[in-house]
UniProtKB/Swiss-Prot annotation:
HAMAP family: Guanylate_kinase. It comes from Colwellia psychrerythraea (strain 34H / ATCC BAA-681) (Vibrio psychroerythus). Keywords: ATP-binding, Cytoplasm, Kinase, Nucleotide-binding, Transferase. ATP binds at residues 12-19. It is found in: Cytoplasm. The gene is gmk. CDD domains: GMPK. InterPro entries: GK/Ca_channel_bsu, Guanylate_kin-like_dom, Guanylate_kinase, Guanylate_kinase_CS, P-loop_NTPase. Essential for recycling GMP and indirectly, cGMP. This is Guanylate kinase. SUPFAM superfamilies: P-loop containing nucleoside triphosphate hydrolases. GO terms for cellular component: cytosol. Residues 5-188 form the Guanylate kinase-like domain. PANTHER family: GUANYLATE KINASE, GUANYLATE KINASE-RELATED.
């Protein structure tokens, strides 16, 4: 029997290190990599950029198709950003979870609120910078944004951080290796929940209890 995958949401202000943590988590040599994991691929109406492939970076669709999917209630969450739509397909996520794949959604706090309403069992994680000063230093260290853009990102970061207490877990990314260990621990913790183990270890407990099957507990 396939053990259903877990759904995780990771949210963070720009510069907190969320993308780096996700990439490190998914590396084959990570402690959590014994089980299949994948970052969700969003649907979007924006044009593909050079080097982006349909189905790999995004699912590129027309505005008409996206709005049709909205009318069908096909998204766990969606938003319009700078005139383009972005959304997370409910059917695609559920298909991956049913195959035993742990799925990670890289979305903001507003998207997290939408997903929680549809899937209360989702595990939500907020990645926080260690300080305003460090966050600004990281943003400036990229060398790609003007002072005006950095000021805007800092204001947006404050708005993002004001919702930290809506999440199940908070990781402060001060030391990257420690933050990665914290994230890995959360993922492994969810896999050890009784609901998961009663399926994964069904044969074991059937033998221990001398019964044909053990019904998963809520």
């Amino acid at each position: 029997m396939i053990v259903p995958g877990n759904l995780f949401i990771l949210s963070a202000p720009s510069g907190a290190g969320k993308s780096s943590l996700i990439n490190a988590l998914l590396k084959p040599d990570n402690q959590a990599s014994a089980r299949a994991m994948q970052v969700s691929i969003s649907h979007t109406t924006r044009d593909a950029r050079p080097g982006e492939n349909n189905g790999e970076h995004y699912h590129f669709v027309s505005v008409e198709e996206f709005k049709k999917q909205i009318s069908l209630n096909a998204f766990y969450e969606y938003a319009e950003v700078f005139g383009n739509y972005y959304g997370t397909s409910e059917a695609a996520i559920d298909a991956q979870l049913s195959q035993g794949i742990d799925v990670f959604l890289d979305i903001d706090w507003q998207g997290a609120q939408q997903v929680r309403m549809k899937k209360p069992g989702v595990t939500t994680i907020f990645i926080s910078p260690p300080s305003k000063e460090e966050l600004e230093s990281r943003l400036r260290g990229r060398g790609q944004d003007s002072d005006e853009v950095i000021a805007s990102r800092m204001a947006q970061a404050q708005a993002e951080c004001s919702h930290y207490n809506e999440f199940d877990y908070v990781i402060v990314n001060d030391d990257f290796e420690q933050a990665l260990l914290d994230l890995t621990t959360i993922v492994n913790n969810q896999r050890l929940k009784c609901r998961q183990q009663s399926i994964a270890q069904q044969s074991l407990f059937s033998k221990l209890l001398n019964i044909e099957a053990v019904e998963p507990t809520e």
